[in-house]
Structures are given as C-alpha cells and as structure tokens.
A protein has these predicted regions:
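Bacterial N-terminal signal peptides that target proteins for export
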Residues: 2-12
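Extended ligand-binding groove/face enriched in aromatic
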Residues: 105-109, 117-242, 247-252, 360
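Acidic/histidine-rich, surface-exposed loop or edge segments in extracytoplasmic proteins
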Residues: 36-37, 198, 269
Length: 401
C-alpha cells in the first residue's frame, strides 16, 4: 500500500513537471521575425523596439554602396563625409551605444578609417562638420586616445575661428559650386544648427579648450536671433522665407528644418555642461519649441511637412516627425517636459513612425532632399530619416511615462 502510494506520488510529480515543461514551451520567447511582424501591436515593448532598430540599421547599412534607389538621387548623396550620411551616423551611434548593440559601431569605424577621419571638403560650410560628431564619438570610446583621429577636425575649426566670419546671414545671391551661398560660411540656414555646433562643443569636451564651445554658442544665437520667429518660436529655413506664405496664408515653417533645430538643441543640452552660462537659455528655447511643436501634431501622429498647414500636405512624413518625436521623448525622459502633457504626443509620434517601417526594414515616407515643404511618397526613403528614427528609438527604449 505504501509503495503504491509512493509510486503514485512519483507519477504525479513527473506529470506536473511535464505540464510545467509544456507550459514553458508554449510560452517560448517570440523570435525576432515574429516581433517584427507584429511591431504595430507591441510598438512600445523594448524587445520589439530593439528588433525594429536593428532591422532599419541593417537595411540601410547594407545599401550604402549603392544609393541610386533613392528618388531624386544626386551624386553628392554618396559623399560619406556629407550631411546626408552624417545625420544617419548620429542616429546609428546613439543606437549602437545601447547595451547589446555594439556591433553597429563596426560600420561607423570602418567608414571613419576609410575617410581618414577627415571633415567634409568645404571648410566653413556647417553641413561638412557633422561627420566630426561621429569621429569625436568614436574617439571618446577609446581607452587609449589616438589624437591623430581628431587632428583634422581641430585644424579645420581652428582655421574657422581665426577667420571669424562676420558676413550677413541673408540667404542671397547665386550659389558657388563647391561652396554654396556666400552666407553659408556662417550658419545662415536653420539645418546647420543640427550639423555643426555639436561638433564644436564635443571638441571642447575632447580637448578641454573652451574656445570651441564659445564660438559655437556665439554663432548659434546669432542664427537664432536672425531666423527664429518670436511669435511661434519656430525657425524659418532661411531668409528667403521671411515673407513667404503658403496657399492658406500661413507662414512657411518647414517640418524637417524645425526638426533639425529642435533635435539639435536637444543634442546640445545633452553635451553642454549644465553650469555653462548659456545652458538655461538653451533649455528655455527647447521648452518654448516643445510647446509649439506638440500643439502642431496631427491626429495620425505625424507632423505635416509645412507645420502650419491645415489642409495641404496630408501625406505622412517621417524625417520631421522623427526629429520632433525624438526631442519630445528625450525631454520627457530627462524630466524637462511634463509627462502628462507630452507623453501622449510622444506615443502618437512613435506609433506613426513604426507604421512607416516597411516589411523589408526600409523606412518610408521620408521627404527627399530639399529646403521647403514638398510632396512625399510611401516609397521615399533617405539616410537622414533613418538617423531621426534611430534617435527616437534610442529614447523609446527607456520611455516610461
């Protein structure tokens, strides 16, 4: 009788173990493919965000050697030291910095070495400074610093400081091949505020020389005084748009242009010491822009390519939306923005961005290169759009409102 009872207990134990094993098998972790396929159902799940970010990065990096698939392809898009690539590098570096994502440093380091750690060819042009942000970020990761990797950046910025251009910021005259407009030896267009000042501030951190930050600070506020609309706190792309209006009679504020500025200010706040005399001023600018930007989001979660448009430009657009969502998410994460007010805007923006990710990993609905609101299609992609998306994804990995 006793042996029968013991045998029964053993069988019961085996049965319970088998049941537990079956339950564990039934609850196996979903694969990356499964997470990606259901990305819209679990867009805020960190595991899903991780898969989406990896898919976008891999898709784009695999195609860097041939960009002719892009609508409105131009030869300068292939310039790996230019702003189109540079904006992508900023996003990939932030994504690679997350635990477990270190493999994404490899293509950045390969490009830096192949390009000999050189800035772009145009000495003064802000667009050709953004690649320096990648160089300095990679340099900062080194345990034993190799100063030669940032020598060219130092020499170029020293030359600019010594010249200290004082020209007008008016965007006038014909462009000069290889240089741009005459005014572009300074930051006379709002995009430049994402491309250049961060490189200067990062160089101060790398060298200990405050002159670089002071120069960037001076030029940033000169551009802001010139291009910012005091009523809306938004930026005109350049002086050509001061008096222009759209078909509805609105001032023309380009979404990606303001995205460049807004994300650029967030990036400055991330690297500028909080005891710097201008830190509070940047933070106030950031908060003022946040209030305006949050109020201009549309019901589908996107911002229109022309921010004040009510009827026109109804198509989604992901580069402006990416930079806006990134800036807002960062502010909520850092406690600079009220979560109750801004977290719903961030969530709508992130859902919108995820909806634009195609099944092969391509990000669609990215407005092609331009300087103003324009048409955009689902099949449009661009490297800077991926950069904006990855900046946002990095913040969404720790977004907990």
């Amino acid at each position: 009788m006793k042996r029968t009872r013991q045998m029964g207990l053993r069988l019961l134990g085996v049965a319970l173990c088998m049941t537990a094993l079956c339950a564990c098998a039934a609850e196996a972790e979903p694969t990356a493919d499964e997470l990606f396929a259901k990305r819209m159902d679990n867009a805020f799940d960190p595991a899903t965000i991780d898969v989406i970010g990896d898919r976008l990065t891999d898709w784009q990096v695999e195609r860097l050697d041939d960009l002719t698939y892009l609508r409105n392809y131009r030869n300068n898009i292939a310039d790996r030291r230019g702003w189109v690539h540079g904006a992508m590098y900023v996003g990939i570096f932030n994504w690679a910095a997350l635990p477990g994502n270190e493999r994404h440093y490899e293509p950045l380091l390969k490009i830096a070495e192949e390009e000999k750690w050189l800035l772009g060819d145009r000495l003064f042009h802000g667009d050709d400074h953004i690649v320096g942000q990648m160089y300095l970020s990679l340099y900062n990761r080194e345990e034993e610093k190799d100063g030669e990797k940032i020598d060219h950046t130092i020499r170029q910025l020293n030359t600019i400081m010594a010249a200290d251009p004082q020209n007008s910021l008016e965007f006038a005259g014909d462009g000069i091949r290889g240089v741009g407009r005459a005014c572009q030896i300074r930051w006379c267009w709002c995009d430049a505020l994402f491309m250049s000042p961060q490189t200067w501030i990062m160089l101060t951190a790398a060298t200990g020389d405050p002159q670089y930050t002071e120069f960037a600070d001076k030029e940033f506020w000169a551009t802001t005084e010139y291009l910012q609309d005091p009523e809306t706190h938004l930026y005109f792309r350049d002086s050509r748009y001061f008096t222009q209006q759209d078909e509805e009679g609105n001032k023309i504020f380009w979404a990606r242009g303001n995205g460049w500025v807004y994300a650029g200010v967030a990036n400055i706040l991330r690297i500028l010491p909080q005891d710097h005399p201008s830190y509070a001023k940047y933070l106030q600018l950031y908060k003022d822009m946040s209030k305006t930007i949050a109020g201009l989001q549309h019901g589908n979660g996107f911002w229109r390519v022309s921010l004040l448009a009510k009827e026109k430009y109804e198509s989604p657009e992901t580069s402006g939306t990416g930079f806006m969502t990134y800036g807002l998410a960062w502010g909520v994460n850092e406690g600079h923005l009220d979560a109750e007010t801004y977290a719903p805007v961030v969530r709508k923006g992130w859902n919108a961005l995820v909806s634009a990710v195609q099944d092969d990993g391509m990000l669609g609905w990215v407005q092609p290169i331009g300087a103003a609101p324009d048409s955009v299609f689902e099949t449009d992609s661009q490297l800077y759009g991926v950069g904006a998306f990855l900046l946002t994804a990095t913040q969404m990995m720790r977004f907990d409102d």
